[in-house]
Each structure stands twice: as structure tokens, then as C-alpha cells.
């Protein structure tokens, strides 16, 4: 996956995770809260992966 796709997918997962956590909070559903937190973390990791790809590409392009 390219860096832009990683960032977009990561942001989508992060937002979906936040929504699940909020729904879990509203319904007092611990399982939904946990799933939301996991999806939010996955999204953050995907975004970081995209940023890392950009940094590596930038470093390679400078050489």
C-alpha cells in the first residue's frame, strides 16, 4: 500500500474506532469500547506507517 493510502486508511480506521468507543460509552458496552480502542490504535499505526514511508522516500530521493 502506498503512503497516501496508508494515511487515508489509517484515518478512516481511527475515526471508526472513535465512533465505536463513543457508542460503547453511550451504551455502557465494554466490548464495543475495546473494539473501538483497538481499531483506533490500528488507524494510528497505519498513519505512522504512511508517514514513515514518506520519510524514507524523502531520504532516498535526497541521495
From Swiss-Prot:
Region: Disordered; residue ranges are: 1-63
> Please, which domain of life does this record's source organism belong to?
Bacteria
In which residue ranges is the amino acid composition biased (Basic and acidic residues)? 51-63
Question: Per UniProt, which keywords does this protein have?
Answer: Plasmid
Say yes or no: keyword Oxidoreductase present: no
User: InterPro entries per the record?
Assistant: CsbD, YjbJ_sf
* Low complexity: bias regions: 34-49
Q: Which family does it belong to?
A: Belongs to the UPF0337 (CsbD) family.
Q: What is the protein named?
A: UPF0337 protein RA1131
Kindly list the organism's lineage. Bacteria, Pseudomonadati, Pseudomonadota, Alphaproteobacteria, Hyphomicrobiales
Amino acid at each position: 500500500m502506498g503512503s497516501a493510502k496508508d494515511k487515508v486508511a489509517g484515518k478512516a480506521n481511527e475515526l471508526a474506532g472513535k465512533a465505536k468507543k463513543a457508542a460503547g460509552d453511550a451504551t455502557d458496552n465494554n466490548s464495543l469500547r475495546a473494539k473501538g480502542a483497538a481499531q483506533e490504535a490500528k488507524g494510528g499505526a497505519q498513519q505512522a506507517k504512511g508517514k514513515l514511508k514518506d520519510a524514507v522516500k524523502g531520504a532516498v530521493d535526497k541521495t
